[in-house]
Regions:
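Beta-propeller blade termini and top-face loops
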Residues: 1-181, 185-197, 204, 211-249
Length: 249
């Protein structure tokens, strides 16, 4: 078996394959605080750093991992309206054979990372609940995409199975109890200096959205402003190195 990911560069119309490994359907793509690509084995049900071994090498097949459910997506907790003790943890959706939204601890070791199950956020005995992706919204709530279908799988059931629901679908909004939405910064229509300063934000999604806006600007204008922004960074800032990494991205 041979599977992996594709990186699409819209302006160049270039598609690059990377991160191959001996498994199937490598779902669950996100990025950690330092921009490292994190994905999940759907069969072995564990997240890992999806690096890019030189062709034809692959990631080794996982061993000793708890293979109990397929995975569709994950997101790291980094919004301030979520409890302090949850910061840096991972929320993950599993779509079969369990139907749940989980909270996991992302633990770093000398030579890699490992996830540790903490608890369920949502668990349903209704098998029509099929969470397939999740993302933070600008107000700090987490949104889960629920396929909501009594039949799942293209191999297990006929494509013409009458029970297939082609119309329904739900979006779940998750917010910690008593938490209030955060005031999102202006991104669309913001000036270049404002967008660059958003790269200092601890919330990954704000940085991601800001970089999307910056990519639409003229490269020479961005480079001039970015060079000045990097030059004025405070080396005593605990996040100084992180800001430099954001500038490279």
């Amino acid at each position: 078996q041979n599977s992996g990911w594709f990186a699409w560069e819209p302006k160049l119309h270039r598609l690059t394959a990377f991160g191959t490994h001996p498994s199937t359907n490598p779902w669950g793509v996100t990025f950690d605080d330092w921009g490292q690509h994190v994905a999940s084995y759907p069969i072995f049900a564990s997240a890992h750093h999806a690096l890019d071994p030189p062709y034809p090498e692959q990631h080794p097949r996982p061993s000793g991992l708890q293979a109990y459910s397929g995975v569709c997506g994950q997101e790291f907790i980094d919004f301030p309206n979520w409890p302090k003790e949850l910061q840096g943890m991972m929320v993950k959706v599993r779509y079969k054979s369990t139907n749940r939204v989980e909270l996991l601890r992302w633990k770093e070791y000398e030579y890699g990372y490992q996830e540790e199950y903490v608890s369920d956020i949502i668990f349903s005995t209704n098998l029509s609940f099929i969470p397939v992706d999740l993302r933070y919204g600008p107000g700090g709530a987490m949104y889960v995409c629920d396929w909501y279908n009594p039949v799942k799988g293209h191999a297990q059931y006929s494509l013409r199975d009458e029970r297939r629901d082609r119309k329904s679908g739900r979006i779940w909004r998750i917010m910690p109890k008593e938490a209030k939405p955060v005031n999102p910064p202006k991104i669309t229509g913001a000036s270049l200096p404002q967008l660059l300063n958003l790269l200092k934000r601890p919330e990954y999604r704000y940085r991601y959205w800001a970089k999307r806006e910056i990519r639409e600007m003229k490269p020479i204008t961005v480079k001039t402003a970015l060079d000045e922004w990097v030059k004025n960074l405070d080396p005593n800032d605990p996040r100084h190195r992180h800001h430099q990494v954001e500038a490279m991205w």
